[in-house]
Swiss-Prot record:
Biological source species: Nocardia farcinica (strain IFM 10152)
GO molecular function: GTP binding; phospholactate guanylyltransferase activity
Name assigned to this protein: Phosphoenolpyruvate guanylyltransferase
Database matches in NCBIfam families: F420_cofC
InterPro entries cross-referenced by the UniProt entry: CofC (IPR002835), Nucleotide-diphossugar_trans (IPR029044)
One protein family per Pfam: CofC
Length: 226
């Protein structure tokens, strides 16, 4: 892999612990399928960007790992502990492994739940970000981090979790100002999912939502959705 190629890293929790804030709208098995569908759309968009050479998915979940490999991704096993600290440690370890194998490649840590992500958004991020140093794209709320890009050969040093944008900026990351609605729209709630659909969710997420009958407005009761 050539220096300054970008290697993307995507962390995914165990499926039985994912998307708990959608529990009032979706049964556990539907939430698990949604996580996989959104990951598929996120990976498909990411691997379509010419400047991104490879994707590694960091996960303790076998089903997630199988999907990642089927889409051409690499897998770094994350310890099963479910916390922001364990996720950040696993991302950092995966990033160090990438650098050990491929030298001074650029690193891009992405959220896994970006079903409306478009390749041109990521391409614009890579074109807009400073050639050296660190940069982030905040999420739609302005407090989380949708993407963390490291181009200075330094450690990834991820700080995902509550208020991660502030922590990444305090550590020297530039807050990129582009619009990029699909990149900024991670999905934690029913309202987030509806907005992602409005923006144009990818084919895997659309197919899953049709299959499980996600057709009601956000404020309507769960019994009419599932």
């Amino acid at each position: 892999m050539r220096p300054h190629a970008v290697h993307a890293l995507i962390a995914v929790k165990r499926l039985d612990q994912a998307k708990s804030r959608l529990a009032d709208r979706l049964r556990p098995e539907h939430r698990a399928r949604l996580v996989l569908a959104m990951l598929a759309d996120t990976m498909t968009a990411t691997t379509s960007v010419p400047g991104i050479a490879a994707v590694t998915v960091v996960t303790p979940d076998a089903a997630v790992a199988d999907l990642a490999r089927s889409l051409g991704g690499h897998v770094h096993p994350e310890p099963a502990a479910d916390s922001a600290d364990s996720l950040n440690a696993a991302l950092a370890a995966a990033a160090a492994g990438v650098r050990a194998r491929h030298g001074g490649v650029d690193l891009l840590a992405l959220q896994a739940d970006l079903p409306a992500l478009r390749p041109d958004e990521l391409a614009d991020v890579l074109a807009t970000a400073p050639r050296g140093g660190r940069a982030i794209v905040t999420d739609h709320a302005g407090t989380g981090t949708a993407a963390l890009l490291v181009r200075d050969g330094g450690e990834l040093a991820p700080a995902f979790g509550p208020d991660s944008a502030r922590r990444h900026i305090a550590a020297g990351a530039v807050d990129l100002p582009g619009e990029w609605p699909g990149l900024r729209r991670d999905v934690d709630t029913a309202a987030d999912l509806e907005r992602a659909v409005e923006l144009g969710a990818g084919s895997s997420t659309r197919a899953l939502l049709r299959d499980i009958g996600w057709s009601c407005r956000v404020h309507e009761p769960a019994r009419r959705v599932c």
